[in-house]
């Protein structure tokens, strides 16, 4: 049995929550969530390989203890091979897929270690596939700057700690290494920007991770902002949902009018932006994650790609009018994960 090792830096909740859901549990026998630090703490390829085999052994025991989840014979073979390789890895890692998620949350040192781990995996004598290879995958600043340079986005992004200043206003501030959204109100001019940056500096929060982002207004004629979400899992791209809000910084849906819910349902069934999304994921060299974006007159505005996204929504939201959307998306996610192995 091939496994999917899902590496995270900060929050293991998104993938674990999905695997505990009624639909996501179909993939639980194959997916092994674990923290980067489990590998980073090991010295050299042999010790790293042994750590991977240790988790393969744990997963095999768990699957054998739940005989109705997967065929017994496959898990017994995985257990036997894992125990053997644990004592003598000999250049082998467990066969399967290694997903480097949470890349945007890694420190500079963490990125360096992730690149080293990726190189070790690439030299494995086993059949190993790497998603979000940290030696290739673009992080937020590089992605947004590339999308602007390519004419896909109409807004640019800047690093104030490197002396970069915006060419147009309004702008807002955000951190590059999290998904909490804006850390400022809309800033209308250079004087307001200088004041906002000075406040951050005085609080000790003006770091190299702070970005200046030009504001792009995507509200419709009714003042409603629609934030689309779509997943990439290996070679598959599929919609997640649309969040509607009157707030320009849209994190979750605040509006549930019937016509908006119908628009969301149509979106997840038809995936109208499929070709463009595939192009953007390929451009960023991102194999696993969720893109957040809006549409204006047929043109896309990409806000970010989260490499450790929420998959299963809160239990209270899984009922009512949006339940068909969540069920469909989770079924597609489970199918996409199975297709990896």
Give a label for each model feature.
Residues 171, 211, 238, 289, ...:
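Protein kinase-like catalytic core scaffold
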Residues 229, 290-292:
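Short, surface-exposed charged micro-motifs
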Residues 21, 37-168:
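Conserved N-proximal alpha/beta basic substrate-recognition cap immediately N-terminal to
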